[in-house]
């Protein structure tokens, strides 16, 4: 199994090959924390939501991958993504680089294997920082502590394991970007409205700047829009269940230090590589086309 994950400001959506490198744990993507969570799938999903709320965060949305896949005519084992976390824990990373918002709030994937066992997977704080190009270890501490608290409450008992290594994870060409002609609010709304046309749909919109009213400096306007394409997502979830951690797709919209609105979205080919899916898979091509179209539409280019 091999991998290359990459992040930057102005990558070409059509350029570059994905180089892959071995990872150490089968079924566990680079830069993640994976816990065994017993055999009760529904209770685990509920405990994750409660843990987020009880540790000072909020649940943004819950995505039932299995239900969405079923609606698309594909049967997969139970798989649910819980998106949410503490706004305060995100701020140190966002203050250094708003592109970190492409992987915030945290995403917790609960899935059940064919043997009935339930697992819980989440990105490590080191991964979120790495793909955003934030080298400062101190900026990751709040997110790491918050994630550990959620995991410890959702799956009580065993200590939270060490994250898998950041094999092949770099901040180069991970985030594709397009400059928008409008404000952050207008651009995010364009994204949402554009996504609500078949085959895509908007799943959630998060104002990440809203949580910055603490003693530290406020961050510039930053929003994230989550977008699903069930027809393309479902076959990928069936072939590579761990990719549920990175679906639905997300778009971060922010005001940069030159007062320009930017739209950034992870290159889905890099996401595919992280989960062992071929970059030329037709469903990956469909998601890439969706993302490019929506970004250009929101930017006012088309």
Regions found by a protein language model. Give the residues of each.
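C-terminal motif of bacterial Sec signal peptides marking the signal peptidase cleavage site
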Residues: 6-9
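Bacterial signal peptide processing site
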Residues: 11-14
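Beta-strand/loop substructures that line and gate deep hydrophobic ligand-binding cavities in soluble
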Residues: 101, 107-133, 250-277
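Ser/Thr-rich, low-complexity intrinsically disordered terminal regions
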Residues: 41, 46-109, 193-252, 271
């Amino acid at each position: 199994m091999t991998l290359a994950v990459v992040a930057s400001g102005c990558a070409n959506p059509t350029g570059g090959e994905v180089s892959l490198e071995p990872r150490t744990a089968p079924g566990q993507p680079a830069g993640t924390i994976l816990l065994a969570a017993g055999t009760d799938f529904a209770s685990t999903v509920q405990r994750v939501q409660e843990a987020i709320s009880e540790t000072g965060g909020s649940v943004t949305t819950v995505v039932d991958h299995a239900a969405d896949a079923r609606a698309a005519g594909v049967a997969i084992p139970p798989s649910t993504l819980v998106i949410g976390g503490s706004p305060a824990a995100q701020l140190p990373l966002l203050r250094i680089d708003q592109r970190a918002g492409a992987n915030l709030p945290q995403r917790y994937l609960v899935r059940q294997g064919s043997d009935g066992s339930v697992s819980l997977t989440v990105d490590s704080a080191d991964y979120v920082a790495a793909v955003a190009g934030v080298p400062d270890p101190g900026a990751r501490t709040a997110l790491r502590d918050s994630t550990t608290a959620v995991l410890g409450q959702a799956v009580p008992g065993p200590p939270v394991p060490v994250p898998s290594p950041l094999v092949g994870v770099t901040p180069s060409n991970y985030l594709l970007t397009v400059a928008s002609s409008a404000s952050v609010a207008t651009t995010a709304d364009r994204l949402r409205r554009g996504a609500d046309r078949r085959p895509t749909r908007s799943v959630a919109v998060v104002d990440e700047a809203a949580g910055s009213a603490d003693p530290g400096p406020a961050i510039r306007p930053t929003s994230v829009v989550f977008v699903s394409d069930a027809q393309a997502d479902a076959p990928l979830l069936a072939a590579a269940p761990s990719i549920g951690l990175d679906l639905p797709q997300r778009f971060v919209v922010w005001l940069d230090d030159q007062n320009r609105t930017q739209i950034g979205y992870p290159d889905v080919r890099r996401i595919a590589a992280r989960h062992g899916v071929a970059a030329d898979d037709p469903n990956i091509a469909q998601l890439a086309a969706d993302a490019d179209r929506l970004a250009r539409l929101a930017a006012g280019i088309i």
